[in-house]
UniProtKB/Swiss-Prot annotation:
Listed GO biological process terms: regulation of presynapse assembly; regulation of synaptic membrane adhesion; synaptic membrane adhesion
Main location group: membrane
Compositionally biased intervals (Low complexity): 406-423
Taxonomic superkingdom: Eukaryota
Span of domain Fibronectin type-III: 308-395, 425-523
Gene name of the record: Lrfn3
Name the UniProt record assigns to this protein: Leucine-rich repeat and fibronectin type-III domain-containing protein 3
Species, as recorded: Rattus norvegicus
Intervals holding LRR repeats: 84-105, 108-129, 132-153, 157-178, 181-202, 205-226
Keyword Nucleus among record annotations: no
Post-translational modification: N-glycosylated.
Length: 626
């Protein structure tokens, strides 16, 4: 009993004499090596055959290496709460997907290696939270798209960006221009075809720019390039020098690259791909005088165009030059035209006015410009009065009033023009439809001598079954036309118009000649031919029947012959078989009996038996004397 009070007295002193216990640490993932004995903590799992990020990671780790594994995705929870992580390597895995916000807790991360994976795009939320990131390695992926806001959180801190060996055709150049602290920018081995002017003008700390092996035909001058000496190789170059690499591009060596040719550079492997005269030559061996451009030349423009108000109009202008000229349009009022609610400008030099107005009439100017100069061409557009209102699916056959010829509707507006109506009645202008059959009809109209300057006639018609208007252009000297390919058993509405040149306005106009309605005859329905399989089956059955009948007849004949020539009862001879007795009297002496003449050979008979009854020869049978 005396021991218990002693233990109670010593119990308060026990914690003071025990050493402090370290904080509990997570177990090291299988096949990984963990450094947890001293700071900084690290988890090293290279080549461990991992299929996903281990869930038992020590969240206090400052370095995590998961390279050379088979990780296919990075989920939101995989790296959660790793606020002290400084270096993360996910190189050479099979990562196809990175969840939005997967790195949101890695606010202290300095380096992120995602090279050698299978990423196809990088969105705005996938790199969110990396506010201290300095090195971002995305090379050797399959990136085809980079979102404009993908680098927003690390734009002010990023120093090294590697996008090489991807499938990038376009880049968010405005976003790249905000990387003010970037030192190295790797864009090599992509599919970039152009770089906008001034794309690198704000990258004041840029020391190396690699654009090797892209599809660049030209490199625009940039203030950054003119401010720093360019050297092909960094060896021996000053610290402030910019290293620019652009070999392996199909450079078009014309006057746009003279600025680059004038810069002092060490030996490099750039070569010209075009024009043909310079193709394959070493870039730095081509003299400056050979970097020439050709001024633009307008090769095609639209002829004077006349359209009624409210209709669309298309103005075209084509030009050639080196480099390819850019075509712009100037309105008759002197305004530079572009895409708007009423007009659309296309890169090929076409200007489309969606709805023309009277004030649009005048001279439009086409301007083709390139680095060597510019060329202009004028296109006249006349906007006439709007056409008279037309009923739906109808074409008026009334003649226009004097001095108001209706403008010829352009083919592009044919669907919006007046159509032949279902209620058109034959007029008194002499348009007749004769000799109409099931699929053809002959149209005749009188001579239009009162209308001068007729260029051609136009026949337009449609059937009662559809609203598609069909046009036929007829020479001016014709007075009839045979319509073919008509549908049988349908009613057609038809109008004939005279196309002529109006002397007052100089425009092409139309005047109705007349309209008519006719019906095609119904087609005779031919007898349906028997189906081929049916014919084949019938022939087989008939042939089989003939064969069976022949066999039956043959068997019947055999049976009949057997019955007629069959075996007779014994003791009777056939009546039809004459037999001469061989027992005859020959002058009372025995001698050889002459045989009867041999009968003519008869048809073979099966199993024919002939029995002859011969009485014994003796004295009692001698014939009586005379």
């Amino acid at each position: 009993m005396a021991v218990l009070p002693l233990l109670l007295c010593l119990l308060p002193l026990a914690p003071a004499s025990s050493p402090p216990q370290p904080a509990t640490s997570s177990p090291c993932p299988r096949r990984c090596r963990c450094q947890t004995q001293s700071l900084p903590l690290s988890v090293l799992c290279p080549g461990a055959g991992l299929l996903f990020v281990p869930p038992s990671l020590d969240r206090r780790a400052a370095e995590l290496r998961l390279a050379d594994n088979f990780i296919a995705a990075v989920r939101r929870r995989d790296l959660a709460n790793m606020t002290g992580l400084l270096h993360l390597s996910l190189s050479r895995n099979t990562i196809r997907h990175v969840a939005a916000g997967a790195f949101a807790d890695l606010r202290a991360l300095r380096a992120l290696h995602l090279d050698g994976n299978r990423l196809t795009s990088l969105g705005e939320g996938q790199l969110r939270g990396l506010v201290n990131l300095r090195h971002l390695i995305l090379s050797n992926n399959q990136l085809a798209a980079l979102a404009a806001g993908a680098l927003d959180d690390c734009a002010e801190t990023l120093e090294d960006l590697d996008l090489s060996y991807n499938n990038l055709e376009q880049l968010p150049w405005e976003a790249l221009g905000r990387l003010g602290n970037v030192n190295t920018l790797g864009l090599d081995h992509n599919l970039l075809a152009s770089v906008p002017a001034g794309a690198f003008s704000r990258l004041h700390k840029l020391a190396r720019l690699d654009m090797t092996s892209n599809r660049l035909t030209t490199i625009p001058p940039d203030p950054l390039f003119s401010r720093l000496p360019l050297l092909a190789r960094p060896r021996g170059s000053p610290a402030s020098a910019l290293v620019l690499a652009f070999g392996g591009n199909p450079l078009h060596c014309n006057c746009e690259l003279v600025w680059l040719r004038r810069l002092a550079r060490e030996d490099d492997l750039e070569a010209c791909a075009s024009p043909p005269a310079l193709g394959g030559r070493y870039f730095w061996a081509v003299g400056e005088e050979e970097f020439v451009c050709e001024p633009p030349v307008v090769t095609h423009r639209s002829p004077p165009l006349a359209v009624p108000a409210g209709r669309p109009a298309a103005l075209r202008c084509r030009a050639v030059g080196d480099p390819e000229p850019r075509v712009r349009w100037v309105s008759p009022q002197g305004r530079l035209l572009g895409n708007s609610s009423r007009a659309r400008a296309f890169p090929n030099g076409t200007l489309e006015l969606l709805v023309t107005e009277p004030e649009d009439g005048g001279t439009f100017t086409c301007i083709a410009a390139n680095a060597a100069g510019e060329a202009t061409a004028a296109v006249e557009l006349t906007v006439g009065p709007p056409p008279p209102p037309q009923l739906a699916n109808s074409t008026s056959c009334d003649p226009p009033r004097d001095g108001e010829p209706d403008a010829l509707t352009p083919p592009s507006a044919a669907s919006a023009s007046a159509k032949v109506a279902d209620t058109v009645a034959p007029t008194d202008r002499g348009v007749q439809v004769t000799e109409h059959g099931a699929t053809a009809a002959l149209v005749q109209w009188p001579d239009q001598r009162p209308v001068p300057g007729i260029r051609m006639y136009q026949i337009q018609y449609n059937s009662s079954a559809d609203d598609i208007l069909v046009y036929r252009m007829i020479p001016a000297d014709s007075r009839s036309f045979l319509l073919t390919d008509l549908a049988s058993g349908r009613t057609y509405d038809l109008c004939v118009l005279a196309v002529y040149e109006d002397s007052a306005t100089g425009l092409t106009a139309t005047r109705p000649v007349g309209c008519a309605r006719f019906s095609t005859e119904p087609a005779l329905r031919p007898c349906a031919a028997p189906h081929a399989p049916f014919l084949g089956g019938t022939m087989i059955i008939a042939l089989g029947g003939v064969i069976v009948a022949s066999v039956l007849v043959f068997i019947f004949v055999l049976l009949l012959r057997y019955k007629v020539h069959g075996v007779q009862p014994p003791g009777k001879a056939k009546a039809t078989a004459p037999v001469s007795s061989v027992c005859s009297q020959t002058n009372g002496a025995l001698g050889p009996v002459p045989s009867a003449p041999a009968p003519e050979p008869a048809a073979p008979r099966a199993h024919t038996v002939v029995q002859l009854d011969c009485e014994p020869w003796g004295p009692s049978h001698e014939p009586a004397g005379p």
